[in-house]
Amino acid sequence: MNAEKSPVNHNVDHEEIAKFEAVASRWWDLEGEFKPLHRINPLRLSYIAERAGGLFGKKVLDVGCGGGILAESMAREGATVTGLDMGFEPLQVAKLHALESGIQVDYVQETVEEHAAKHAGQYDVVTCMEMLEHVPDPQSVVRACAQLVKPGGDVFFSTLNRNGKSWLMAVVGAEYILRMVPKGTHDVKKFIKPAELLGWVDQTSLKERHITGLHYNPITNTFKLGPGVDVNYMLHTQNK
């Protein structure tokens, strides 16, 4: 388990990295800024594991892993997991938590494009959760994910749709009213319509397999997966 540094390439938003660096120490605080990620992680994990036909014994890459919430949970399922992130502090938190938990995860500080140049076609599963809306060129990330997965392997994306409802729910509601995430976490201009993401996927070797929405009910304070991709959504693709 290590956290290696590497040269920064063009597809990095330093302001976005700084946001997460500032709160990295609270990544594993179940009642802190990352509480929503902890709450939705079981849903993400079950969706990924089910759609990929299980994770045990598979080589998995988590792109934009942050403090390692999803990466650790996939490792617990028996996967060999590598976590990528450009934030040094989140990776240090992830490394320490994995050590404390007795979980083996290889954490690397580099962009997915850099990783793809060295590890093309090496992964059974690639996950990229809530990361595309935080980089200058999300299409480049999609291309790199396609390069990294083996033939027949699975790639999963999750992001936010760009429309009035997603602005109300993810920005006004989540940041200012419910205060579920820190103010300034999201920029609606960077949200990605499903048609845009699918268009980028179509320009790679990936093929769409399934898409689902991730929904929050403020009355019951619960999350669920289901039809409707007007706010948060997850996309399962497979390498042809």
Swiss-Prot record:
The keyword S-adenosyl-L-methionine applies. The lineage of its organism: Bacteria, Pseudomonadati, Pseudomonadota, Gammaproteobacteria, Enterobacterales. GO terms for molecular function: 2-polyprenyl-6-hydroxyphenol methylase activity; 3-demethylubiquinol 3-O-methyltransferase activity; polyprenyldihydroxybenzoate methyltransferase activity. O-methyltransferase that catalyzes the 2 O-methylation steps in the ubiquinone biosynthetic pathway. Pfam families: Methyltransf_23. Its EC number is 2.1.1.222, 2.1.1.64. This is Ubiquinone biosynthesis O-methyltransferase. Belongs to the methyltransferase superfamily. UbiG/COQ3 family. It catalyses: a 3-demethylubiquinol + S-adenosyl-L-methionine = a ubiquinol + S-adenosyl-L-homocysteine + H(+); a 3-(all-trans-polyprenyl)benzene-1,2-diol + S-adenosyl-L-methionine = a 2-methoxy-6-(all-trans-polyprenyl)phenol + S-adenosyl-L-homocysteine + H(+). One of its GO terms (biological process) is methylation. Gene3D superfamilies: Vaccinia Virus protein VP39. S-adenosyl-L-methionine binds at residues 44, 64, 85, 129. It comes from the Bacteria. Pathway: Cofactor biosynthesis; ubiquinone biosynthesis. Keywords: Methyltransferase, S-adenosyl-L-methionine, Transferase, Ubiquinone biosynthesis. It comes from Escherichia coli O157:H7. InterPro entries: SAM-dependent_MTases_sf, UbiG_MeTrfase. The gene is ubiG. NCBIfam families: UbiG (TIGR01983). CDD domains: AdoMet_MTases.
